[in-house]
């Protein structure tokens, strides 16, 4: 019977405990009823921000803030900033001693309070003047250190083949990242992180610097796209050598193309003989005037010297044949010539007939 009773109690106890309302313990100061963020920017100023007031927490539109360092008299916020015409935060100056921050509803009930060193909410400025340089297969990263201690500098890098960031950290902004391939393009970024043992868990790291791209075989910032993977130990060919090989290959291709075109042209269009070999002086003396060249060539032919005309006359020896009258003789150059053979002797031409001859 007792065992049954304990079994029933064990079954009902979780339900009874779940029905009892519980209060969430507060993690902050007295009267916390809204979310407040405090940031100490590079130990130069303190920024306190909170929600939009009544729109989220059912409170009055504007809250008031008081602060003091050490045992000073509480002071009102020197500079509020607004969000949608409602107070949303306050910027405080730096001071010595513990910082106490109090938020009130219209100057009455306390809604939030904190009391710590301002450095407990430290957020350093991002590193500046960061320099990256290749040394073999490592990249040296350096930048000026902050004016206060307790920071750790973190460098992250990645390449086009591994998009996940890889981290390297050191207590000073002078560190090296090893195991890199100079033929690849890498992205780098740097930030400063407060150490927990020095500032506490509420300190926040700085923002990342802008991403800088770097490649070992090219000028700084020359990364224009993904690079092809290389076999380890194989040096990257210089750009000049690659360009020279490309030019030589292109020249060889052009020469082969020209030679092939010349052979095709010779097969389709046979060569035309040069008239200078067959007609000497045609172009040198007569400028291509063929008629003038013919006249000059005929004038240069040696002529046979003329003999006595009486020797060239052949007189018929037949008796009883009378000489033709003058009016029967055909004048030289007459277009109406009789029949007979044309004969040239020396520079004279004769038309031979059956009964005589005629001088032309």
Curated annotation (Swiss-Prot):
Residues 1-18 form the signal peptide. One of its GO terms (cellular component) is external side of plasma membrane. Keywords: Disulfide bond, Glycoprotein, Membrane, Receptor, Signal, Transmembrane, Transmembrane helix. Expressed in all tissues examined including brain, thymus, lung, heart, muscle, stomach, small intestine, liver, kidney, spleen, testis and skin. Highest levels in thymus, liver and testis. Pfam families: CRLF2-like_D2, TSLPR_D1. A motif (WSXWS motif) lies at residues 205-209. It comes from the Eukaryota. One of its GO terms (biological process) is inflammatory response. One of its GO terms (molecular function) is cytokine receptor activity. Glycans are attached at residues 62, 129, 174. Disulfide bonds join 77-90, 185-223. Residues 27-238 are extracellular. The chain crosses the membrane at residues 239-259. Residues 123-214 form the Fibronectin type-III domain. It is a single-pass type I membrane protein. A motif (Box 1 motif) lies at residues 268-276. Residues 260-360 are cytoplasmic. Belongs to the type I cytokine receptor family. Type 5 subfamily. Receptor for thymic stromal lymphopoietin (TSLP). Forms a functional complex with TSLP and IL7R which is capable of stimulating cell proliferation through activation of STAT3 and STAT5. Also activates JAK2. Implicated in the development of the hematopoietic system. The WSXWS motif appears to be necessary for proper protein folding and thereby efficient intracellular transport and cell-surface receptor binding. The box 1 motif is required for JAK interaction and/or activation. This is Cytokine receptor-like factor 2. It comes from Rattus norvegicus (Rat). The gene is Crlf2.
């Amino acid at each position: 019977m007792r065992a049954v009773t304990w079994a029933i109690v064990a079954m009902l106890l979780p339900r009874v405990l779940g029905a009892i309302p519980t209060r969430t313990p507060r993690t902050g100061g007295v009267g916390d009823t809204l979310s407040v963020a405090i940031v100490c920017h590079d130990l130069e100023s303190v920024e306190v921000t909170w929600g939009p007031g009544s729109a989220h927490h059912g409170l009055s539109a504007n809250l008031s803030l008081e602060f003091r360092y050490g045992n000073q008299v509480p002071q009102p916020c020197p500079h509020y900033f607004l969000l949608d015409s409602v107070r949303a935060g306050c910027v405080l100056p730096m001071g010595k001693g513990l910082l106490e921050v109090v938020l009130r509803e219209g100057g009455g009930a306390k809604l939030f309070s904190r009391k710590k060193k301002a450095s407990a909410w430290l957020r350093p400025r991002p590193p500046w003047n960061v320099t990256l340089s290749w040394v073999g297969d490592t990249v040296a990263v350096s930048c000026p250190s902050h004016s206060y201690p307790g920071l750790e500098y973190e460098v992250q890098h990645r390449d086009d083949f591994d998009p996940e960031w890889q981290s390297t950290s050191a207590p000073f902004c002078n560190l090296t990242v090893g195991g890199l391939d100079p033929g690849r393009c890498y992205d780098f970024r740097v930030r400063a992180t407060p150490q927990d043992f020095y500032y506490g868990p509420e300190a926040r790291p700085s923002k990342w610097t802008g991403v800088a791209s770097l490649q070992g075989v090219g000028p700084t910032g020359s990364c224009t796209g993904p690079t092809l993977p290389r076999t380890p130990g194989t040096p990257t060919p210089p750009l000049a050598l690659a360009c020279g090989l490309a030019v030589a290959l292109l020249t060889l291709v052009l020469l082969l193309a020209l030679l092939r075109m010349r052979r095709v042209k010779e097969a389709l269009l046979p060569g035309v003989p040069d008239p200078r070999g067959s007609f000497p002086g045609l172009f040198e003396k007569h400028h291509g005037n063929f008629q003038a060249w013919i006249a000059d060539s005929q004038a240069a032919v040696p002529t046979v010297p003329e003999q006595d005309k009486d020797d060239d006359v052949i007189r018929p020896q037949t008796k009883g044949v009378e000489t033709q009258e003058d009016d029967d003789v055909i004048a030289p150059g007459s277009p109406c010539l009789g029949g007979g053979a044309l004969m040239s002797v020396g520079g004279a031409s004769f038309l031979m007939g059956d009964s005589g001859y005629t001088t032309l």
